[in-house]
């Protein structure tokens, strides 16, 4: 497995693969890899001849410097896992190489229709940071296919719109959420949980399932459903952060024509901000 840290060497290797006619898959990550990431890798391997995994803790995605500083950086362990899973290349650049002019002078890619709603309303600039780094990685790696987890549902929708709007010839694949046996969605941030908090954490999924069942049975008093769900989260020990029920395709409020809903949840448990989502088929 190749480990490349500079842009010129990455371009050189990508050019070589292109000359050989190889199909390239990209799995963008911020490192601290877990089995959910490995599922993305395994999916990517079925879709391409070579798989590139990027590991870059993107400063543009963090509102608070302390959150950026404490984000786990485990490059050696990550590379060992990726070697075992047959990855061809790890791209692990420094921030100074990705943003040589500094963050203030950086050119941004924005998807305004999706970057300022829902989670984006409370995290200004976050999704602009996502679309900027993903666009840059697309330009550098020039993948035929890129795999993203469905756990970050709004992010996936934003990337799909960016690809469509910008004319990228890239197949965007959403890979289903990977869960622990007790239902907790796998996340790098689960490492922030204490032992006691880890026992509580699966309640997020169970509470979301109960909400999904009510929607599937035809309940449509959205404000009441959300208020009840928030109360259940608080009773379980969470601090609710974001809670939405939206049209799964447009991310806009449900209408009589909506065929599928998406429940988007984010809640704090101790120092960990846990997110999850679930799609629900709506029957008229």
UniProtKB/Swiss-Prot annotation:
The parts of the chain that form a coiled coil are none
GO biological process terms, semicolon-separated: pantothenate biosynthetic process
Name the Pfam families for this protein. Pantoate_ligase (PF02569)
Indicate where this protein is primarily found.
cytoplasm
- Where beta-alanine is bound, by residue? 61
Give the catalysed reaction(s), semicolon-separated: (R)-pantoate + beta-alanine + ATP = (R)-pantothenate + AMP + diphosphate + H(+)
What pathway does the UniProt record associate with this protein? Answer: Cofactor biosynthesis; (R)-pantothenate biosynthesis; (R)-pantothenate from (R)-pantoate and beta-alanine: step 1/1
**MF-aspect GO terms:** ATP binding; pantoate-beta-alanine ligase activity
Q: Which domain of life is it from?
A: Bacteria
Q: Where in the cell is it found?
A: Cytoplasm
Q: Which cellular components does GO assign to this protein?
A: cytosol
InterPro entries assigned to the protein according to its UniProt record, in alphabetical order: Pantoate_ligase, Pantoate_ligase_C, Rossmann-like_a/b/a_fold
Look up the EC number in the record and give it.
Answer: 6.3.2.1
Q: Which UniProt keywords apply?
A: ATP-binding, Cytoplasm, Ligase, Nucleotide-binding, Pantothenate biosynthesis
Residues where (R)-pantoate binds: 61, 155
- Which sites are catalytic? 37
Q: Where does ATP bind?
A: 30-37, 149-152, 178, 186-189
Q: Which family does it belong to?
A: Belongs to the pantothenate synthetase family.
Q: NCBIfam families from the entry?
A: panC
Q: Quaternary state and partners of this protein?
A: Homodimer.
Q: What does this protein do?
A: Catalyzes the condensation of pantoate with beta-alanine in an ATP-dependent reaction via a pantoyl-adenylate intermediate.
Quote additional remarks. Answer: The reaction proceeds by a bi uni uni bi ping pong mechanism.
Designated name of the protein:
Pantothenate synthetase
Originating species: Yersinia enterocolitica serotype O:8 / biotype 1B (strain NCTC 13174 / 8081)
Instruction: Please name the taxonomic classification of the source.
Output: Bacteria, Pseudomonadati, Pseudomonadota, Gammaproteobacteria, Enterobacterales
Identify the gene encoding this protein: panC
